Structure formats: structure tokens, C-alpha cells
Amino acid sequence: MKLKWKFNDLTGEKELERINRIVIDTEEKVEKALAFIDLEPSEAMFFNGYQTWTLSREYSRYDKMRGLNGMPEGVIRRYSLDGYGDYHIASYPYKPGVFHGFSYCYFRDGENYRFFGSLDEKPGYTIFGYNVKKNRLKIIRDAEGLVPDGSFHLLDLFYIEGTEEEVFDAWFEALGINAVPAPKIVGYSSWYNRFQDIDHGTIVQDLKGCKTILEPGDLFQVDDGWESAVGDWEPDPEKFPSGMKAMADEIHSAGFMAGLWISPFVAAKGSRVLKEHPEWVINDHKGETFSCGCNWRGFYGLDIDIPECLEYIENSVKKAVFDWGFDLLKMDFLYAGATFGNDKETRAGRMIRIMELVRQWVGDKRILACGVPLMPAFGLADYSRIGCDVGLSWRDRPFLRQIHRERVSTVNSIMDTIYRRQLDGRAFGNDPDVFFLRYENIELTEEEKDIVATVNALLGSVFLTSDDPGKYTEEQKERFRYYRHLTEAKNVKLIQHERIGFSYILDGREHEYLIPEDKVKE
């Protein structure tokens, strides 16, 4: 296959090889940096989404990739719906057979994969765009506006054909990336039951409940709601009057690993830090404030190029692990710290720098990355979310299905977990999000709860619930123990014929699990 490339006014071509590096000697500002490969479509095609929550599944040649198409501009602006994903980077024509993704993609026919992956994202995200009608794969280096210091990596591309195991093993070998040794963890997160409505009393209540079912060394994670404001990383004095060190000590006394949610690279409207330092906010290329989403009535990314801002972020992170004693930080909304690059650094380069910084700051404490472009987290995060948030229902309300690809959706979370499964143990430990067994405050059927728990147990390295186990019946406790045992399954293989499912080996015997067909249709 021929690979044709273009850098500004320069053009060239070469034979596609396993490793394709094109380096341009230049100090010229990047205006165009792309390549083309003529390529026949496959029966199934996968394009990795921009970040953790971006829907990432296999597509047929007849499918469409939905962005914010049809959403009124006023609604987009009011709720900053374009702040969560790649809507300021890529276009969404919403036509059959037109797809795009970041860092890697593949074309699958049966068991044979044609795989394309980036070997280095620091010079700019590698964006793969495909058009079935044109039979063309377009590869864009997301580096517009960058001024190189003498050379520019137009392309660092890996290509291979083979089975799933062969192509992903070969890619990570070529990358030279080894996942941080991260054992599977089981435990609890406060988010998907109490959400931000937590305080010392409710956390202690759930901690007591967890002692009835969790094992020593399991994770007990305090999620969003403990802080006085997002961006002001001190405990709310009314909710947690004894402070977060006391909370971590209580978790440790119960025999569990203590986890804490934090979003150190963002600040919400109304936070003290934004009132005192409005100049810390990241602006877009026009110099205008860019809202990264509508959580907490709106929030903004913080500029790590401002020394005082970076020091503030570093101190907030270190305080949580070294002063308060938390063993794991769930670092959320990481993408917001790198929504834009500049003439010296691409947005991907900035995202990688953020991940390198937090790895350095926390030392051997554990990082669970969330809301993060995935490849910058390879080999740096211990664990990473690889899908969107699950919901309390299966498909959510019809009007919510029209918003961004990063929306809360249980069925989308299942798809993400299935189709990003290959990253588990290679890039980091995959976190598929939580499962539920409870009967209250939930709309999922028993069948749907079983699907979530089974998929998470088989394909992930993080297996958390947000239930209060103190309310579990003996039957629910037995089911919890069953799913926990399922996390020990070996040789898990995807089945993709008339129905999606898995084969696996547990207790020396081969098993098969099939998901009902109507549950995984978009």
C-alpha cells in the first residue's frame, strides 16, 4: 500500500511498512500535516474515541457517527456540550461510512485485523478519518499552529495485520510501553448512589456496610462531594468537620485501601480559586474563555504554563496523598487541562506532560485516571476509565440520547468496555465503571444488572459497586461473591457472531456468556 503525505506545501509518498516515521526538517509553522492511504473497508471498523467517555465501538460501513448533529446551537452553548469531546477539533458530517478516531483504529474481517496505531502522540494527536465511499484513510497530525524547533514528526505510524492478540501485542512492543503493575481491585465508590450528597455520617454508614462484604485491602473510594468547591481542594467544613485525614484514617482502620476523587486541573464557576485567579483559566485560540462542560454549573481548565497555578495544582495533589494519607486518587476531568495547545506544544503534548507530572507527584501511590485521552495515560496511570459513566437506567431518556458521545449511558459503557478491552494489562488496568446489585434508587432490571456486573468482572481490572452493602440480603451477598470470583476468570475471549458474548476459563472449566441481542443495539 502507498502512503501519501503532505506537510504545508511539501508532498511525498512511500510504501506502507510496519513502522512509518516521517520527520520534516523545518522551523516553519505547521498549517497542514496529514497522510492518505487508499484502503478497502472491512465488515467491522473501530476508531478510538477522543477521551475516556467518548463512545468507542465497532461500526459497519452503513453506520453513522453522531456528534452534536441536530442539537440547537443555543443548547450547545448553554450547557457547553462541545466542551467534553473533540467537537472543537474534528468534524461530524453524520453520513454513513464516515468515521474518525484518535491514536489507533482497526479494520476487522472475522479474526483478521488491519491495525493502525500511533507510536508517539507528543508531536500531536494522530487522528484517523475514514470514508467508505472514497476507500480512503486520512491521517491527520493535530499540530496546527505549532512552530517546530528544527524538526517535526509528521507521522509516527505503526501498521500490522494479524489476530487481535498479535496486533495489540506487537503495537505495545513497538511503543516500548509496559503497564504499571496494577493488581485487580475490588471495592466501593460513593458516587452512583449518593452522588454529591455525602458527608462524614453517610460515608461512615457505607464504610460499616462494606465491612460486611469487602475483604481486607479492598478499595473504599470517597467520590465527588467532599470538597468545599471544585477547584478549592479543602474539605467542606460542614460535611467533613474532622477533615479528610481523619476520613482516610477511618478507612484504613476498617482494613481498606483509601481512595479519593479529585479533579486538580479544573475549577468550577464560583470557586474561590477562580475568584482570586481568573487569569489561570485556559483560553481558546481566539483568547476567549472556553467552558469544558456544564458540571457544577460550568467549569474551566487551569493553565499549567502559569508557575503559580501549577504549584497550586501540585500542592493539592500531594496534600491528598502525603498529608491526608489516601492510597489512590481518582483524577477526573483530566482532558480539561489540555483542551488547546500553542505554538510551542500541541494539546497532546500538554496532556502527556500532565500525566507525567501527576505520576511524578504521587510516587508509588495509585492513579485512577478518568476523563482522559487514553494514549497519553499509557504506562503512566495505574488504572484508567475506558468508558462513559453508567446510568441508573439502561438507555436513558430519549432526548438525552441526542447529546454528545460522552454522555452518561449504561449501554454505551458496555460497548466501550468491550471494544477497549485490549488495553487492559497492556496500557494500564481498565476501569469499566461500577456495577449494581441494589433494589432501591435504580431502574436497571435484574438482567441488565447481571450484564453490567459480568462484563465488568470479565474485562476490567477495577470492580467497584456504589451500593450500600449494609443493605444487602444474603442472596445479594452471594451474588457479590459470585461476581468477585468471576474476576479471576482466565483466557477471556470475545464471541462476535449473531450475539456478542465471551468464552472464559474459571475453576478449570470453560464457560460461555452471551448478551441478549436487544441489549446492545445503539
Kindly label every feature range from the protein language model.
Residues I185-Y188, Y192-K318, W324-G341:
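Aromatic-lined carbohydrate-binding/catalytic grooves of carbohydrate-active enzymes
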Residues L154, Q221-V222, G259-L260, K330, ...:
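A structural signal for short, well-ordered beta-strand segments and their strand-loop junctions
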Residues M244, R347-M355:
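Amphipathic alpha-helical segments in well-structured domains
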Residues M1-V167:
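N-terminal accessory beta-strand-rich subdomains and adjacent acidic, glycine-rich linkers
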Residues I203, G209-L214, D236, M247-A258, ...:
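Carbohydrate-binding surfaces of carbohydrate-active enzymes
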Residues A170-I185, I367:
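Acidic/polar, glycine-enriched structural segments that form the non-catalytic walls/loops
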